[in-house]
């Protein structure tokens, strides 16, 4: 496998199919628990100070400079209602939601900031201005010193920023889906404006450091596939993806990724034609099999794709997922092992510890 690579270069080389000394370990959403899960694990381990990075030896992920790709200024965070079990808030993205206090599940989304094209125009003018100097606030001397010290690779783009994902955040999923028919010009303007806003911020980053990874958060799939038709994806979204791909080529960015839950097969087929080089998390219960994706897309970077439900089962269930990961590493690489989303509270600490031990051996070539 050759020389030992810095952690960031190892990440990028692994995802782009270049030789590496070993596969990165503990990188991605599939290595992290829900709050209630971590509470359970600390109890089962008898370790109230259990720290997964420290105790399991996770590798560093990407380093992200301070770039605000969302509402600026943000909405004021407000608590609207409280009960012993729930709290209702309006968050800094203007979304009203009801959350469990124990952090055991996703929140319930109650209201969104955009209901009409007029709301969008006002929000665009007041909180989504292009070129606002306050969007990039990184201390570049300190950031470059960090990169020199740690060897991390640089990422721009993050949750909750994507051409579908952010409009969904502004409108709500049902309202966005109907807006493709009822207000298509608003939807198109949202996507085009946001893309321009992000690229203008990334240009400022690229003037200071090398960007290694652009991430786009979409979350636009369900069990049956994409929430909008491939034709709509092509018509509304892909011109924006092409702009991102142009930026990536101009600045030598080697990894461009999309995060979408659910069955992502249609989107992988389409988006890899428009500059996307990596996908995650490949939820198994939605019908994704990363081995089949590897056969169909030999140059696709893949992160995750191991069934988190195995962690509620037996060691034999875990072993089957470890073998899935080992097959991926043996057959073409461009793969970083991980589970297929955040780890739910039914996962046993012993199973997760066992899985981490076995997957670490896969990553290190054992």
For each predicted feature, which ranges?
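A structural signal for short, hydrophobic beta-strand segments that form beta-sheets
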Residues: 76-81, 85
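Active-site loop segments of alpha/beta catalytic cores
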Residues: 1-42, 87-90, 99, 103, ...
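Extended Gly/Ser/Thr-rich low-complexity repeat segments
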Residues: 97-112
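Segments that shape or occlude catalytic/ligand-binding pockets
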Residues: 34-77
């Amino acid at each position: 496998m050759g020389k030992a690579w810095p952690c960031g270069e190892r990440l990028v080389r692994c995802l782009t199919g270049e030789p590496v000394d070993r596969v990165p370990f503990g990188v991605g959403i599939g290595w992290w628990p829900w709050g209630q899960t971590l509470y359970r694990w600390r109890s089962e381990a008898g370790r109230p100070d259990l720290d997964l990075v420290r105790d399991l030896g996770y590798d560093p992920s990407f380093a992200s400079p301070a770039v605000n790709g969302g509402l600026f200024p943000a909405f004021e965070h407000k608590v609207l209602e409280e009960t012993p079990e729930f709290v209702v808030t309006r968050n800094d993205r203007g979304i009203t939601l009801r959350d469990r206090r124990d952090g055991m599940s996703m929140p319930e989304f109650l209201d969104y900031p955009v209901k009409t094209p007029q709301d969008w125009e006002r929000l665009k003018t007041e909180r989504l201005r292009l070129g606002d100097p306050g969007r990039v606030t990184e201390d570049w001397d300190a950031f470059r010193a960090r990169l020199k010290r740690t060897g991390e690779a640089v990422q721009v783009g993050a949750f909750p920023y994507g051409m579908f994902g952010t409009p969904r955040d502004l409108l709500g999923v049902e309202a966005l889906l109907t807006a493709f028919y009822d207000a298509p010009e608003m939807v198109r303007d949202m996507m085009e404006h946001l893309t321009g806003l992000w690229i203008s911020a990334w240009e400022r980053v690229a003037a200071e450091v090398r960007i290694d990874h652009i991430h786009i958060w979409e979350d636009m799939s369900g069990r049956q596939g994409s929430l909008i038709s491939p034709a709509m994806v092509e018509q509304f979204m892909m011109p924006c993806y092409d702009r991102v791909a142009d930026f990536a080529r101009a600045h030598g960015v080697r990894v461009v990724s999309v995060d979408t839950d659910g069955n992502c097969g249609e989107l992988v087929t389409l988006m890899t034609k428009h500059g996307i080089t990596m996908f995650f998390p490949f939820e198994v219960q939605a019908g994704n099999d990363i081995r089949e994706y590897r056969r169909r897309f030999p140059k696709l970077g893949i992160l995750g794709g191991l069934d988190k439900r195995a962690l509620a089962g037996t060691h034999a269930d875990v072993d089957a997922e470890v073998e899935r990961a080992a097959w991926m590493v043996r057959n073409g690489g461009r793969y970083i092992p991980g589970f297929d989303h955040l780890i739910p509270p039914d996962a046993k600490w012993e199973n997760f510890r066992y899985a981490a031990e076995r997957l670490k051996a896969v990553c290190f070539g054992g």
